[in-house]
C-alpha cells in the first residue's frame, strides 16, 4: 500500500524540497509514497485571498483564520491522521515516526504568522506535533523533517532493512560510534575490537558505547532506558 502524504501550506513550492533527493526521492519516484500539496490561500473567502486576521484581544502578529483552514481541510479526504505542526505540540520522536510509518498516510497542516485559530484545532480534531523546543518561520520545515523521518521507515525504502534497527533512539539509546577505512587517520586508530572478527565482542562494545554516550549526552533518555531495562 502506498503511503499518502498531504500537506496544507501557503508555500506548496517548498515541497518536496530535499525529500526529492536520496532515499526519500528515490522512494517517491518508485511510488512507495506520494505527496500532495494543498494551497490554503485557494480557500480564502475574499477577493484579496486573505488567510489571516488580527488576534482577538490584541497582540502582535496575525492569526490564521479557522474558516479558511476548515475549507482547506474539508476539501481533502479524511483518510489519514491529521497533524498541525506546532511548537507547543506533542514532541515528535523516533517511536512516533515508526507509528506513523505504519499508517496509510498523514495530513499535515503548516501554520504561519502567530499560529492558527484554536477553534480549528478543536473542530477538526487536529493533533499538534512539535519537532523541538524552538520557533521556526512556519510549519513547512517541520513538516519536511517529519516526513523524512517517516518515509525512510517505509518498507522498501532503505536498501538494508537492518540499517534502521541500530540507529539512535531505536532501542532507547543513542547510536554507537561508527568507523571505516583508513584504519589510521591522523594518528587515530579504529578500535581493535571492531577489526577482531569476534562478533560477540563487537556487539558488546557497541552496546557499551551506546550506553556511555547516552548517559553523557542525554541523561534523561538514559534514565528512561535504565528504568525500562530494570523492568525486564
Swiss-Prot record:
GO annotation (BP), single: tRNA N1-guanine methylation
Enzyme Commission number: 2.1.1.228
UniProt binding sites for S-adenosyl-L-methionine: 111, 131-136
GO molecular function: tRNA (guanine(37)-N1)-methyltransferase activity
TM ranges: none
Pfam families hit by this protein: tRNA_m1G_MT
Primary location group: cytoplasm
Any one annotated GO CC term: cytosol
Subcellular location: Cytoplasm
Reaction(s) catalysed (UniProt annotation): guanosine(37) in tRNA + S-adenosyl-L-methionine = N(1)-methylguanosine(37) in tRNA + S-adenosyl-L-homocysteine + H(+)
Keywords of the record: Cytoplasm, Methyltransferase, S-adenosyl-L-methionine, Transferase, tRNA processing
Family: Belongs to the RNA methyltransferase TrmD family.
Subunit structure: Homodimer.
Annotated function: Specifically methylates guanosine-37 in various tRNAs.
PANTHER family assigned: TRNA (GUANINE-N(1)-)-METHYLTRANSFERASE
Name of the protein in its database record: tRNA (guanine-N(1)-)-methyltransferase
Native source organism of the sequence: Bartonella quintana (strain Toulouse) (Rochalimaea quintana)
